[in-house]
Design a protein with these regions (language model features):
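Short, charged, surface-exposed hinge/linker loops at domain edges
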Residues: 1-4, 35-59
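Short aromatic-glycine-(Arg/Gly/Cys) micro-motifs in beta-strand/loop hairpins
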Residues: 2-19
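Small side chains
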Residues: 6-8, 23, 37
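Short stretches within intrinsically disordered, low-complexity N-terminal or propeptide regions
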Residues: 8-10, 29, 50
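A short, exposed loop/beta-hairpin motif centered on an aromatic-Gly-Thr core
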Residues: 19-32
Length: 59
């Protein structure tokens, strides 16, 4: 399993999620943050979802 740290920042009516070394994505709600971060990592690294762990930090 590969560990990543994502940072989420509220920007108006949406959230911006940054995963260093991977990329940036956005989400509409707090409930979507972790799933969107994991989706970003799996898409950009071609890694299976079960092999990814994302620690989410909301700032």
């Amino acid at each position: 399993m590969t560990d990543y740290t994502a940072t989420a920042i509220c920007e108006g009516d949406h959230w911006v999620i940054d995963v260093p070394g991977v990329g940036t994505t956005q989400a509409e709600t707090v409930d979507d943050l972790e799933d969107m971060a994991v989706d970003l990592v799996t898409a950009m690294t071609h890694t299976a979802r079960q092999d990814v762990h994302v620690e989410l930090r909301i700032v």
